[in-house]
């Protein structure tokens, strides 16, 4: 698909998702956060599943004008596929093969202002978006899944309450988190983090060439 056609698809997706998110947000007062003790964490972290996804994405987007520095981390099923033949773009081919064939499990976003300050008078500053994942169906590396389980990720919840990947991508488009030059993304060794997000946003496999991958990264982030 050409970049021109892809840009058109991005715009259409944004319009459709925006209409729905506005309808969802108009049914509640987003400026007054309704906290659910079962998903709230006293450390400033809120767990987001499909039942509170629309509300929390709206709450997050409302803060971005003043808190536009985003620390991002993802959890994914490990490195399952290996590239046997060494080549000039070995690392990118390995990244692409794994990202194309595996599913993102969790996206964590922490917001601050340019001084590194968390939002004032808000009960949390970090959103952990938990996506659909079924370990009986989806591919994973056993040691990675064990580590994630030990870290507290509940795979039964992900199977039953995880956010649909396509839905997540559609509404991420209208959240002001992406396609926004005012947002400053921060990640540590984040090629896989951005790779998984880019696959969701494009709605297809990662580009064949690394320079095209970089092109789309610069466009979205």
Question: Over which residues does each language-model region extend?
Answer:
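Entry/capping segment at the start of metal-dependent catalytic domains
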Residues: 32-34, 39-104, 108-110
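Metal-dependent phosphoesterase core characteristic of DEDDh/y 3'-5' exonuclease domains
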Residues: 4, 102-221
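Long, polar low-complexity intrinsically disordered regions
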Residues: 1-41
């Amino acid at each position: 698909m050409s970049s021109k056609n892809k840009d058109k698809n991005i715009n259409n997706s944004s319009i459709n998702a925006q209409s729905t998110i506005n309808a969802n947000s108009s049914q509640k007062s987003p400026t007054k956060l309704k906290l659910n003790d079962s998903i709230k964490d006293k450390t400033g972290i809120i767990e987001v599943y499909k039942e509170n996804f629309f509300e929390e994405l709206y709450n997050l987007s409302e803060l971005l004008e003043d808190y536009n520095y985003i620390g991002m981390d993802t959890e994914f099923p490990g490195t399952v596929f290996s590239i046997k033949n060494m080549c000039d773009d070995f690392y990118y081919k390995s990244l692409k093969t794994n990202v194309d064939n595996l599913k993102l499990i969790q996206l964590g976003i922490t917001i601050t202002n340019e001084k590194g300050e968390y939002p004032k008078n808000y009960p949390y500053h970090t959103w952990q978006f938990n996506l659909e994942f079924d370990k009986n169906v989806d591919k994973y590396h056993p040691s990675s899944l064990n580590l994630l389980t030990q870290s507290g990720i509940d795979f039964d919840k992900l199977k039953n309450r995880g956010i649909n990947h396509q839905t997540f991508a559609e509404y991420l488009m209208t959240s002001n988190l992406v396609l926004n030059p005012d947002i400053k993304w921060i990640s540590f060794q984040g090629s896989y983090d951005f790779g998984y997000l880019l696959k969701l946003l494009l709605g297809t496999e990662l580009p064949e060439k690394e320079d095209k991958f970089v092109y789309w990264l610069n466009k979205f982030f």
